[in-house]
Amino acid sequence: MSSVTGSGITSGFIDLATYDNLERAMYGGSDATTYFVKEHYPVGWFTKLPSLAAKMSGNPAFGQQFSVGVPRSGDYILNAWLVLKTPEVELLAANQLGENGTIRWTKNPMHNIVESVTLSFNDISAQSFNTAYLDAWSEYTMPEAKRIGYYNMIGNTSDLINPAPATGQDGARVLPAKNLVLPLPFFFSRDSGLALPVVSLPYNEIRITVKLRAIQDLLILQHNTTGAISPIVASDLAGGLPDTVEANVYMTVALITGDERQAMSSTVRDMVVEQVQVAPVHMVNPRNAATFHTDMRFSHAVKALMFMVQNVTHPSVGSNYTCVTPVVGAGNTVLEPALAVDPVKSASLVYENTTRLPDMGVEYYSLVEPWYYATSIPVSTGHHLYSYALSMQDPHPSGSTNYGRLTNASLNVTLSAEATTAAAGGGGDNSGYTTAQKYALIVLAINHNIIRIMNGSMGFPIL
């Protein structure tokens, strides 16, 4: 490895001598900021630690809901996550499908175990999200470096979502009991500047309510040669249908100095937060019509629209946004048949009688929009995005449209030829559409809103 001699360093001054009008415009003159002196911004001293949310009410059981109180042990809440232990599941030899029966959890187990989550202040909902939002949000915002770790957290692993044959069959195994973790994507969890100031809210009871799905809508009992799916019953499983689960909500609390605490408690503050809105779900049948529209009666400043056509043929097969139902593949794996493609062909956005977006092919919403305006392009089929914001995952406003000032805004979706074929049913064994496939159009909106913190309480000054 050679070193730069003194004459070589001297030649570097030639580069500096090329400074001209272009460089003056780009770099500035004598008042420009240097690259080599870092400015230090003193900030308030703090520390953080995990805390268990207590004051649980309700029953953490499948098909039930429970709520927990946000801990008052800290000054701010930085984030929250749900920890849930799945039960051990063993398929009996005497199950409905006999020696051909297999059992597995649905895709994205924690997304589907949790039907909805709501953050409330004195019973006023501040933010709520459901399974579809968890599916979509993770597809658009998950950095690739974290994806495998996230799958491990939510149970998207082979030991849970790959088919397990019945007792006595080759490859027979149990679905293990396992601790799963779901990071809850509340508005306060992505930016420390939006941390929830619980010390400023002594007059608000802050609670998180979690609704869990029934176990019958989470476990898939499927024939390993035909692909037929049967609703699971208690006699299929050793010990019957699992009921109660171990579930806890944890949060990271931040502790600040007394000076900052005193200043914070006496200051009126407006926070720009995010909320999730869900349009009424529409059942769509491409055999009746090729194009369907849904009215989007949203409110507030909408920054992004996310839409999917979900395959709802079997309630236990969740997070499926393709034309057909997955089947059991070689080696007891999950196989997506040939028609497991996007049910959407194209879509357009209309404001009253004005076309806001022309009929654009599905690649615009599933590839182009995420490429430019989201962190990630979805790895799963069937997710579509239109972002008004320059960065849909950034909590700082960078573009939106006030849907409260619009009337008759609608999304028009044209379904694909493959969806029409699958909707007719009649496919062969393991085609994924031996029975007629059913679809539902789901539309989600992410909007900005203002929370005002004043006199020890929170409220929404702009309804």
UniProtKB/Swiss-Prot annotation:
GO molecular function, one term: structural molecule activity
GO cellular component: viral capsid
Keyword Ion transport belongs to the record: no
Keyword terms of this UniProt record: Capsid protein, Late protein, Virion
SUPFAM superfamilies: Group II dsDNA viruses VP
Cellular localisation: Virion
InterPro entries for this protein: Capsid_N, MCP_C, MCP_C_sf, VP_dsDNA_II
Family named by the database record: Belongs to the NCLDV major capsid protein family.
Function, as annotated: Major capsid protein that self assembles to form an icosahedral capsid. Represents around 50% of the total virion protein mass.
Known partners and oligomeric status: Homotrimer.
Protein's UniProt name: Major capsid protein
Gene designation per UniProt: MCP
